[in-house]
């Protein structure tokens, strides 16, 4: 906390080693390896008044450190080999903006937006049919209502705006597009 109104933060997560996906050892590079990539970021939150907080984060995801994600699909090595085809994703930097507003003691409403540069190039669409993660922009809305019984209900909604990547070169005609919607409801109880 820099001042009573402003907080700064930084994060770093190393690559997380996952067990081999044995059923996919002939598909994913490194005999079915599929680790979670390292990522790092910085953020700031400003308490505008007693009820309102605004926040901004910048995060970089290092897809290049995981061969099954980063290796280009144009490799001539066999599928599943250490240098075999992957999804061809580039590292990605994501900007996130958020706001939170407290209404009395019982209700908090939240909104957020994130945007990032496309990690999939237009010549890497073939292998990405399996995981067409092409969305660049997301909007989130949510709120938490505290109940008299010490319980709380949280509702959240996320919309990933439609994005398309049109294949080129050897992947001409293999086009990807995606949008997402997600709705969540959770109940919690405070002891």
Q: Could you tell me what each predicted segment is?
A:
Residues 1-191:
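Outer-membrane beta-barrel porins/channels
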């Amino acid at each position: 906390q820099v001042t009573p109104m402003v907080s700064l933060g930084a994060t770093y997560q190393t690559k997380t080693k996952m067990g081999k996906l044995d059923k996919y050892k002939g598909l994913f590079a490194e005999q079915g390896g599929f680790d979670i990539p390292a990522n790092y970021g910085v953020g700031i939150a400003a308490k505008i008044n007693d009820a309102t907080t605004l926040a901004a984060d910048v995060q970089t995801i290092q897809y290049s450190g995981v061969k099954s994600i980063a290796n280009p699909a144009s490799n001539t090595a066999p599928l599943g080999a250490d240098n075999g085809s992957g999804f061809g994703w580039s590292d990605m930097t994501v900007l996130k903006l958020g706001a939170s507003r407290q209404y009395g003691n019982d209700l908090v409403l939240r909104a957020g937006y994130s945007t990032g540069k496309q990690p999939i190039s237009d010549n890497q669409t073939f292998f990405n049919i399996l995981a067409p993660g092409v969305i660049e922009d997301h909007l989130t809305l949510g709120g938490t209502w505290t109940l008299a019984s010490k319980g709380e209900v949280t509702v959240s909604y996320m919309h990933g705006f439609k994005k398309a990547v049109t294949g080129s070169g050897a992947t001409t005609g293999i086009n990807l597009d995606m949008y997402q919607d997600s709705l969540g409801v959770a109940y919690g109880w405070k002891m």
